[in-house]
Amino acid sequence: MSLTLAAHGAYALSFIIDILGAGGAKPPEIAVAMSSACARHRCRSMTAVPSGSAFWRFSLGFYRQGGVAEACIRLQDQDGVDVNLLLFLLWQAVGGRVLSERDIEELERRIAPWRNATVIPLRTVRRALKPAPGLVPAPAAELFRIKIKATELEAERLQQEAMDELARSSPYGRKVSSIEEAARGNLACYAMVCQTSFPEPEIAILLAALGSPEPKLEE
């Protein structure tokens, strides 16, 4: 899901090389080359990361399962969910832990300053660049957007690493025997904290993904 900051320069350079590899291509062909390069580099960005925390590794595998990304984004945009907190609650459910509303409110209080200062502003800029405003040539604007996205994902990785440390230093919630019970309990409590109810189709997608084997992470 992310690039390390040290990898950003190499990532951007290899992206440029991919585009320049189109040689003397005309504008429409350059657009096709850019689209292909974006797809390739999105896949690389999902794996070109250090192994990180157990939570981060869970997130990498879980988020790539079918329908999960779309469900998370819908919950984010429609219900005000912090996707990293949502993933944290599902990761805790895998360990059989059910968090209370107070636990989730405490987590929200701890992570909100970082999220509001970094993740949300970067997301706003990234989304504003698709499609990019005029003035700057489209290839340059798209490369800039990709660099913003890499930085946004790095901000999310740092948030997750901090959340993992919080969970290890002071475990949250109570233990139950069923992953589904824990997941449903955590989602229900988070919905109450958000003062909403999560749509059942999104819940079903997330629960189904929890019951699927985690995709093998590339070394």
What are these regions (language model features)?
Residues 14, 84-94, 150, 164-165, ...:
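Short, hydrophobic/amphipathic alpha-helical patches that form generic packing surfaces
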Residues 15, 55-76:
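Short amphipathic alpha-helical segments and their helix-coil junctions
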Residues 69-112:
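N-terminal interaction modules that seed assembly of large macromolecular complexes
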